[in-house]
Amino acid sequence: QQHYGFSPFAFSICFAVNAVAIGVAATISVKFRQLETGTLTGCIGMLCLSVCVMIALYNGCGFWTYELLMFALLFTMGLTFTSSTTLAMDSERRYAGAASALLGALCFASGGIVSPLVGLGNILVSTGVTFVVCAICSLLCALWAMRKVPMKVAMCRIFR
């Protein structure tokens, strides 16, 4: 908001537009024949677009470039919301309530961890790097959950 010189009201309009991207993608994600495909597509899209956002922010992109990339990034993120939650709840139906609580707590904990990280150093660069790291973690977790990559391999890739 401050970097691009927008008022709080103008920037809240941008948030609303981005929220539409998430909502539309969440609606579309149920159209995939397999829920895993929606999650994997979203995670791969998040990684690709996070790298684009990081490069754009590093190069001091204009607002419209930033907004278009964020809209696309949040769209791909929205693809993962419905399918990943459904897959998590379906994996252990007996413990769906506990799984839901853990997912909610994980989201809040992740937000608490990430929030101070984006303020380190140059806020544009740290934000871009944080997006990429979170996208990598999301993709590795999705691959591990789908059993396409053993947990040991996924963890090694995260901490490499």
PLM feature segments, named:
Residues 1, 32-33, 117-125:
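Interfacial helix-cap and linker-helix signal at transmembrane-aqueous boundaries
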Residues 1-9:
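Short amphipathic helix-loop junctions that connect adjacent transmembrane helices
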Residues 11-32:
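Transmembrane alpha-helices of Major Facilitator/SLC transporters
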Residues 16, 20, 44-47, 71, ...:
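Residue-level signature of the transmembrane alpha-helical core
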Residues 39-83:
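C-terminal transmembrane helical hairpin of 12-TM major facilitator-type secondary transporters
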Residues 75, 87-123, 130-131:
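A late C-terminal transmembrane helix in Major Facilitator Superfamily
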Residues 128-144:
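Symmetry-related core transmembrane helices of the 12-TM Major Facilitator Superfamily/SLC fold
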Residues 143-160:
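Intrinsic disorder in cytosolic terminal tails and internal cytosolic loops
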